[in-house]
Amino acid sequence: MDLLHAALLGLIQGATEVLPISSSGHLILIPRLLGWPDSGLTFDVALHFGTFLAIFVYFRKDVVSLVQDGLTGFFQPEAPRRLRLPWMIVLASIPAAIAGKTLEQPIEELFRSSPLMIALMLILFGLGLGLTDRYGKKLHDVASITLGTAMLVGCFQCLALVPGVSRSGITITAGLLLGLARTDAARFSFLLSLPIVFGAALLKGLHLLKHGIEPGMAMPMLVGVAVSAVVGYISVAFLLKFVQSRTLWPFVWYRVAAGIGVMALLGVGLLS
C-alpha cells in the first residue's frame, strides 16, 4: 500500500466514523468503486486506533471526570445520577460488544458483497435520523440519562454492525428518540463509542501481536493513524458545533443522495 492510498483511507475513516454517514459503508463502497485492493487487518487496526485517539483526546477532560465520578459513585449506592453515568456507559457498551464478537464477521461478509443493501441502509437509517431529529422532544441532557435510556441506546448501537447504518448515526437517532437534546445525543454517542472503538482496536491489535504485522505496512499504518486521528478530531469538533444551531438534515440528504448514487452506479454497471 502506498502512502497516498493510506492517507485517503485515513481521511475516509476519520470523517465517516465520526459523522453520522457510516464509515463501514464508505470503506466498502469507495475502494470497490475505485478498484482498490483490500487494506487488510493491519491497516484496519490502524484506522480504528486513529479514530479512538481522536475521540479520546477531544473528550479527555470528560473522560477524567467520568473516571473520577465512576470511582466515587461505585462506593456510594445512593450516588447522584451524574456519578453513576460512567457505569451506565460501561453497561450500555456490553450489548454491542457481545454482538460485535459474535456477529461482526458474518454480517460484514454478507453486506460486503451487496452494495445495494448498503445503499438501502444509508437511505433507510438516514431518514430515521432525520425524522427523530425533527420530531424528537429534545428535553433531556446527558446528566439526566437513566440506566434504561443508556441501555436502550446501547442496544441500538448493535445495529451499527450493519454497513450503511452508522454507529454515530444510530446512537444519535436513539438518543433523540428517547428525548435527548440534539447536542447531548451527539455527546453521549461519542462517549458511548469510546469503549467500543477501543475494544475493537484492542482485539484486532492482539490478533496482530499473535500473527505479526505484514511486511511493508509500518509506514502506511503510521500515516493511517495520523490522518484518521487528525480528521476524526476535526470532525468531532465540527459535528458538536454544527448541532448546536443546525438540524441533522444535511447528513440525511447526503445519505439519501449517496444511496441513490450507489443504486445508479449499480444500474449502469459501474459498480457491482
UniProtKB/Swiss-Prot annotation:
The keyword Cell inner membrane applies. Keywords: Antibiotic resistance, Cell inner membrane, Cell membrane, Cell shape, Cell wall biogenesis/degradation, Hydrolase, Membrane, Peptidoglycan synthesis, Transmembrane, Transmembrane helix. One of its GO terms (molecular function) is undecaprenyl-diphosphatase activity. GO terms for cellular component: plasma membrane. The chain crosses the membrane at residues 39-59, 87-107, 113-133, 145-165, 188-208, 220-240, 251-271. Signal peptide: none annotated. InterPro entries: UppP. The keyword Transmembrane helix applies. It is a multi-pass membrane protein. Bacitracin is thought to be involved in the inhibition of peptidoglycan synthesis by sequestering undecaprenyl diphosphate, thereby reducing the pool of lipid carrier available. HAMAP family: Undec_diphosphatase. This is Undecaprenyl-diphosphatase. The gene is uppP.
